[in-house]
């Protein structure tokens, strides 16, 4: 049967409509690119967090994010409890067997707790962690047949994906920086060394605009005055989008949300962020 001309595009229109509905239902944020057809999409899925975004996932103190669409598939941090990490992996249909690299931001249990369970599921990975970690950590990684790689300074771990290198004094920590066509995307664990210091380090590595920063900012003890100074630094550094979560603090998250308005990205377990044209 041939459709008459007024209706011949109806199946295509309906397909697009239902695709958009499905995407919204899954809780993803897609950055519009003016109608371009992206060859590849950079995709971030929050697997572990103490805030809920997608129903059916479990919350707990900690952070983990799966990064897909780069040259390598990367798991950034692994949360606290292996069983909760694996529950959310199942609900979100994340495939840990496709992970090539695991980045551990710092040596706190709410970021390392699910690592060895993840390695048991997929040992064919390289684990990047700060050089200050105790030697036993690397030995445990290697005992599970994975490759252990310490990090002390900025390094490119795959095409367009960088680590800041170990930062901080009492608590050593690293963050992840991706050079995307929209600008730098920065993923943080807890930002013990100071979120503004991380942003500046990222700009030192790649002198490009900061498109998005998300993760834990560790600001719960900051006063309103201090927060205004931090937000002013974000604006001075021309950060376009912000997604504060995990250890940032509820009041502090509210201030970021107010300051960034529609450019604030709400975070939580099951949150999916997509950056096209990568």
Task: Annotate the PLM regions.
Residues 75-78, 99-107, 128-131, 186-190, ...:
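Active-site neighborhood of phospho(di)ester-bond hydrolases with catalytic His/Asp-centered motifs
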Residues 43-91, 173-188:
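Conserved beta-strand hairpin/beta-sheet module of binuclear metal-dependent hydrolase folds
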Residues 114-117, 184, 190-273:
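Cap/insert and terminal regions of metallo-dependent hydrolase folds
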Residues 83-128, 203-213, 232-235:
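Active-site metal-binding motif and surrounding structural segment of the metallo-beta-lactamase
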Residues 29, 129-174, 180-181, 235, ...:
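Metallo-beta-lactamase
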Residues 92, 123, 143-144, 238, ...:
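Short, structured coil segments at secondary-structure junctions
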Residues 7-70, 153-166, 268:
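Zn-dependent metallo-beta-lactamase
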Residues 1-5:
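N-terminal secretory signal peptides that target proteins for export/translocation
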């Amino acid at each position: 049967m041939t459709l008459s001309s007024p209706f011949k595009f109806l199946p295509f229109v309906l397909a697009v409509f239902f695709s958009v509905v499905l995407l919204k239902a899954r809780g993803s944020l897609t950055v519009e690119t003016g109608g371009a057809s992206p060859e590849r999409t950079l995709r971030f899925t929050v697997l572990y967090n103490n805030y809920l975004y997608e129903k059916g996932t479990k919350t707990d103190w900690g952070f983990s994010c799966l990064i897909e669409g780069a040259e390598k598939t990367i798991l950034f941090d692994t949360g606290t409890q292996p069983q909760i990490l694996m529950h959310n992996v199942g609900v979100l249909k994340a495939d840990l067997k496709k992970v090539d690299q695991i980045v551990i931001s710092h040596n706190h249990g709410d970021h390392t707790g699910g690592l060895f369970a993840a390695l048991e599921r997929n040992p064919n990975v390289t684990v990047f962690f700060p050089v200050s970690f105790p030697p036993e950590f690397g030995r445990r990684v290697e005992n599970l047949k994975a490759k252990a790689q310490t990090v002390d300074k900025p390094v490119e771990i795959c095409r367009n994906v960088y680590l800041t290198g170990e930062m901080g004094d009492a608590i050593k920590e690293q963050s992840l920086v991706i050079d995307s066509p929209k600008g730098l995307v920065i993923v943080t664990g807890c930002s013990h060394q100071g979120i503004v210091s991380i942003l500046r380090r990222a700009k030192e590595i790649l002198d490009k605009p900061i498109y998005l920063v998300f993760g834990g900012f560790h600001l719960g003890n900051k006063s309103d005055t201090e927060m205004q100074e931090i937000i002013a630094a974000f604006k001075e550094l021309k950060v376009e989008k912000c997604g504060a979560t995990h250890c940032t603090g509820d009041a502090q998250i509210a201030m970021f949300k107010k300051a960034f308005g529609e450019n604030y990205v709400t975070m939580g377990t099951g949150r999916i962020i997509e950056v096209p044209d990568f």
